[in-house]
UniProtKB/Swiss-Prot annotation:
Complex I is composed of about 30 different subunits. One of its GO terms (molecular function) is NADH dehydrogenase (ubiquinone) activity. The gene is NAD9. Keywords: Electron transport, Membrane, Mitochondrion, Mitochondrion inner membrane, NAD, Oxidoreductase, Respiratory chain, Translocase, Transport, Ubiquinone. It comes from Paramecium primaurelia. GO terms for cellular component: mitochondrial inner membrane. This is NADH-ubiquinone oxidoreductase subunit 9.
Length: 209
């Protein structure tokens, strides 16, 4: 009687389906990593709160390069601008080891949050160290309104931007309400001039709280 040939053990039965490997298995996009490697570049991610969300810190001088890479790179072209805002970190005190230590005493810090459909990642870019940045309006149409709000509220000047008019404030106003140096007490009174059919700012006495 000939010995029987041993059968191989299969861990997957015929009815069980094998898990397909994701098509795009990237962490932080390598195109951005190599592009900004020589700059003051840092990034963080969270594996507990949102594992597919990265936070990247760049100098403001790299804003034009960032816009060109996001618009021309193959895996980064299919993206959406989720939100854009700014922060005034003048005199900000942060704990050592926190990623905000890179933004300390940099004045205005811009924040752009993008979602990349092919990578299935969300990356928030913090641009620090300058009040003149390149606009991303040419690649993301919704950046027009977002950057106009940032410009009038924080006094940020955008380069290569077609429309920089104020949205909420009067045209030609020189103050920025969201800056820390903006006075918290009233120093002017806004009245409507019925003869000129426009608003006017009248100086009044300072009020101490």
């Amino acid at each position: 009687m000939s010995p029987q040939r041993p059968q191989r053990a299969f861990f997957c039965s015929e009815g069980a389906k094998k898990k397909k490997k994701p098509k795009y298995r990237f962490g932080f996009p390598m195109a951005l990593y190599f592009f900004f490697e020589k700059l003051n570049f840092s990034y963080w991610t969270s594996t507990t709160v949102s594992p597919n969300h990265y936070v990247c810190v760049l100098p403001a001088a790299a804003s034009q390069a960032l816009a060109s890479v996001l618009g021309g790179e193959l895996f980064l072209g299919k993206s959406q601008l989720v939100e854009a805002t700014a922060f005034d970190l003048t005199g900000q005190e942060v704990a050592a080891g926190d990623f905000l230590v890179f933004l300390k005493n940099n004045g205005i810090v811009l924040s752009y949050s993008f979602y990349f459909f092919l990578l299935k990642k969300r990356i928030t870019f913090f641009l620090h160290g300058g009040e003149k940045v390149c606009s991303v309006e040419a690649f993301y149409s919704n950046a027009n309104w977002l950057e106009r709000e940032i410009s009038e509220m924080f006094g940020v000047s955008y380069l290569l931007k077609k429309d920089s008019r104020n949205l909420l404030l009067d045209y030609g106003s020189s103050f920025n309400p969201f800056l820390k140096k903006f006075p918290s007490t009233g120093h002017t009174e806004v009245v409507f001039n019925s003869f000129l059919k426009t608003t006017a700012y009248v100086q009044n006495a300072s009020v101490e709280l």
